[in-house]
Regions:
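Extended catalytic cores of very large enzyme megasubunits
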Residues: 1-341
Length: 341
């Protein structure tokens, strides 16, 4: 492809011409190549070769779709050159998902190639390879021990490295200035540990295509909730207590919302001892929540009692509880100190 021609087409807002030029370049660049030229390829080559490709479906692709696939998703060979084009890419993903079923692989390919269906990003990037996970979201909870906290840091680092978005519940940690029996000192609270999570998230690149992403969750009745609400606010306060690289969500209880409706105070409770540490004006905290949402788009809201009333019977029989949600607050699964969902 003539790069000058592509630049000229884009500068003239001729996106259709730019798409044609980009597609021609991709097909020329990958001529004689296929997914299995990637050293990480692990899919069933025989199944992939059996898929009947429809090159005419390339015309369904937009310029921006092609550019995104080329930049993020197509596999590369040992020389870091692209070895997939749109149709071989869809065939590789379909093969990985079909697990040896040729008819199903063909059906999946047809759906994706026609634009009827597309899997999540980790599937597109990793399936049929040894590069990473095909799971988008993970949920875990942090125990109130130093060992447990740093175990979570390690787990989150590898989950982010291999393509996962993470939702971590920090509500078990005792609040700031709570006594520590083992040392006779007092706890630094949740926020300094979130600062480490914030730096870790910035440092870990998710599959080298985008930064690792994580959300921290804290109960509305946690002693550190007031500071937690402001960790994403870029102005005011101590920057050592800001966490601008992670998302955050508040786990809201029925008791809090009832206090808001009744214009009454509500209690902050130490998760370690169960003692009441403070009372706050529920309506003022609710206003602060809404103000932060208006200013920063966060925190997320998770109405935890509503969720736990609706969990499946087999979870209830095992006495499992949902503590938080995932990075995007659309998945709710039970977690424990030794169970990552």
């Amino acid at each position: 492809m003539n790069t000058e021609s592509l630049v000229a087409a884009l500068s003239q807002n001729n996106v259709k011409l730019a798409r044609t030029l980009l597609l021609a370049n991709l097909l020329e660049e990958t001529q004689g190549k296929n997914s299995w030229d990637c050293p990480h390829y692990t899919a069933d080559r025989a199944v992939q070769e059996s898929i009947a490709l429809c090159e005419a479906n390339n015309d369904r692709m937009t310029y921006f779709g092609l550019e995104n696939l080329r930049d993020r998703y197509f596999l590369r060979d040992a020389n870091d050159a692209i070895c997939e084009n749109p149709q071989t890419f869809f065939a590789r993903v379909a093969t990985g998902m079909a697990r040896g079923d040729r008819a199903f692989a063909q059906e999946l390919y047809d759906y994706m190639s026609k634009g009827w269906f597309i899997p999540a990003t980790p599937v597109l990037m990793n399936i049929g390879t040894s590069k990473g996970l095909c799971i988008s979201c993970f949920l875990n909870t942090v125990p109130d021990t130093l060992e447990g906290i740093f175990d979570i840091y390690r787990e989150n680092a590898f989950l982010a490295k291999f393509g996962g978005g993470i939702g971590t519940d920090w509500s078990q940690l005792r609040g700031q200035n709570a006594p520590l029996k083992s040392s006779g000192l007092r706890s630094s609270g949740v926020i300094p540990f979130l600062k480490i999570m914030d730096s870790e998230t910035l440092a870990i690149s998710r599959n080298s295509h985008r930064r690792g992403a994580a959300a921290a969750y804290l109960r509305i009745d946690h002693p550190d909730i007031e500071d937690f609400l402001e960790i994403r606010k870029p102005t005011g306060g101590d920057m050592d207590r800001k966490c601008l690289n992670i998302n955050h969500g508040v786990v809201i209880t029925d008791a809090f919302m009832e206090a808001v409706e009744a214009r009454q105070p509500y209690k902050l409770v130490c998760p370690h001892t169960g003692t009441i540490t403070k009372e706050l004006d529920a309506m003022e905290i609710w206003r602060k929540l809404l103000t932060m949402r208006a200013e920063t788009g966060e925190p997320y809201f998770l109405y935890i009692d509503t969720v736990n009333r609706s969990i499946p019977p087999h979870h209830k029989e095992l006495r499992l509880l949902v503590r938080q949600s995932n990075l995007c607050t659309e998945i709710v699964l039970p977690t424990t100190n030794d169970r990552t969902a």
